[in-house]
């Protein structure tokens, strides 16, 4: 596992981001560093969510590529969430290369199975949590994700007899949502507004109808 940690550091050291440094150094030396604190969240809140809540890595990577490919591959600094997603993708790419190298050089099928299972259950889970958090912040808004995590944590810590039947659902879009379509410019949703009802046309009664000069003759 030391080789895995070194690959993480080597993969992220070339990228001048504090977020990546916190993440990699914390994993390497087991430092008490929470990469979610600067976003108003914490590892504890994310750990309240069940393990099967987070989608598979392939699904998360496909989502990140489909929605934010231009931002992730460009040289501009879009937001801290984009930077964190970049580093998570780089770390996972190096991890998959390491697993492929180990699978090719280890003859024991049992050892390979144990190593792959351990990586998926530990570091793979951390990458899944990281990608889900930052993708959700970009999609729903950071404040909405914070409220969801707090609500879910409160529900989990509430005794079962007093717990509401349904868990919170992260499904509310913010007022301003940036939607990017492939091959086109960004489309910004305007704030939600109520559609005004059409004005009623006043019916003119016979008394109010203007009379023609011929009718007065």
From Swiss-Prot:
Q: Per the UniProt entry, what species is this protein from, by scientific name?
A: Arctic squirrel hepatitis virus (ASHV)
Stretches for region HBEAG: 26-28
- Spell out the residues of the site Cleavage: 189-190
Q: Which family does it belong to?
A: Belongs to the orthohepadnavirus precore antigen family.
Instruction: Spell out the residue ranges that the record assigns to sequence repeats.
Output: 190-196, 197-204, 205-211
Mind listing the UniProt keywords for this protein, alphabetically? Disulfide bond, Host nucleus, Host-virus interaction, Repeat, Secreted, Signal, Viral immunoevasion
Q: Which gene encodes it?
A: C
Propeptide residues according to the Swiss-Prot or TrEMBL record: 190-217
Please provide, alphabetically and separated by semicolons, the GO molecular function terms listed in this UniProt record: DNA binding; RNA binding; structural molecule activity
Alphabetical GO CC annotations of the entry are: extracellular region; host cell; host cell cytoplasm; host cell nucleus; T=4 icosahedral viral capsid
- State the name under which the record lists this protein: External core antigen
**Any single GO BP term:** microtubule-dependent intracellular transport of viral material towards nucleus
Q: Where is this region: Disordered?
A: 181-217
User: What main location does UniProt list?
Assistant: secreted
Q: Where is this region: 3 X 8 AA approximate repeats of S-P-R-R-R-R-[PS]-Q?
A: 190-211
Q: How does it assemble?
A: Homodimerizes.
Return the InterPro entries for the record. Answer: Hepatitis_B_virus_capsid_N, Hepatitis_core, Viral_capsid_core_dom_sf_HBV
Q: Where in the cell is it found?
A: Secreted; Host nucleus
Question: How this protein is processed and modified after translation, per its record?
Answer: Phosphorylated.
Q: Which residues form the signal peptide?
A: 1-20
Q: What domain of life does the native source organism fall in? A: Viruses
| The protein's role, per its UniProt record | May regulate immune response to the intracellular capsid in acting as a T-cell tolerogen, by having an immunoregulatory effect which prevents destruction of infected cells by cytotoxic T-cells. This immune regulation may predispose to chronicity during perinatal infections and prevent severe liver injury during adult infections.
Basic residues bias locations: 181-210
